[in-house]
């Protein structure tokens, strides 16, 4: 969903929810390679920001031929930096990075699949940049795939079922990132990219 389109609808939805429930965190899940912070950070109903670094690799275009709207591509730490530079300051989370086992680009089963090393990279990139947490996803778990049942996003009915995908390495390695985050008090963690020695690498470097 684009945050800068049909804004009157999002405003009406948010305000209607607030009218009956003021006790839950509210945010906005945006379209791929975009962030709620860009257009909605100043909204009073927006408690925290979300962005979607998405499922495309560097330079990969959407089906309609458009390139990345922001130019940030899959560098999800850049979305974190951008959101944390805004006023008022709000927590930010990558709500949809690349999912383990999903085709790069999302829909073409002939494309390479995102692996455990990729989902780890997104997790540590965003958390070390200052995000309030991280989202993990798996293609087979997301669809609750079961044997013999074709699914979407490259699933052809012969892939492992969702309950076996729960043994995949990326799924099981996310606990290390979680444990690292919980080691330190939440409100004492302060984003500080200046602690990085040397210059930032490029893409996978």
Residue ranges and their predicted role:
Residues 1-94:
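Active-site neighborhood of glycoside hydrolase catalytic domains
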Residues 6, 115, 119:
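Aromatic-acidic/polar surface patches that form glycan- and anion
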Residues 41-44, 108-110, 148-157:
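Short low-complexity, flexible loop/linker segments enriched in glycine and/or proline
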Residues 41-54, 118, 124-133:
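Structural recognition of alpha->loop->beta junctions
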Residues 58-59, 102-104:
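Short acidic/His/Gly/Ser-rich catalytic and metal-binding motifs that mark active-site loops
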Residues 64-68, 106-115:
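Short, surface-exposed loop/helix-turn segments at secondary-structure junctions
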Residues 88-92, 99-103, 119-205:
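Aromatic- and carboxylate-lined catalytic core of secreted/periplasmic carbohydrate-active enzymes
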């Amino acid at each position: 969903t684009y945050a800068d389109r049909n804004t009157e609808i999002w405003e009406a939805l948010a305000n209607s929810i607030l009218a009956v429930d003021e006790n839950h965190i509210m945010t906005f899940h945006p379209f791929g390679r975009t962030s709620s912070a860009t257009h909605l950070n100043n909204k009073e109903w927006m408690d925290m920001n979300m962005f979607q670094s998405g499922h495309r690799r560097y330079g990969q275009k959407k089906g309609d031929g458009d390139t990345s709207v922001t130019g940030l591509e899959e560098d999800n730490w850049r979305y974190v930096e951008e959101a944390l530079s805004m006023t008022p300051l709000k927590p930010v989370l990558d709500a949809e990075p690349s999912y383990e086992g999903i085709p790069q680009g999302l829909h073409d089963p002939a494309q390479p699949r995102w692996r455990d090393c990729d989902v780890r990279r997104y997790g540590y990139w965003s958390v070390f940049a200052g995000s309030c947490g991280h989202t993990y996803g798996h293609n087979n778990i997301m669809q609750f795939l079961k044997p013999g049942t074709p699914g979407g996003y490259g699933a052809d009915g012969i892939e492992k079922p969702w309950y076996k995908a729960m043994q995949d390495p990326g799924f099981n390695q996310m606990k290390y990132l979680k444990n690292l985050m919980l080691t330190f008090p939440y409100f004492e963690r302060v984003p500080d990219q200046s602690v990085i020695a040397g210059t930032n690498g490029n893409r996978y470097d």
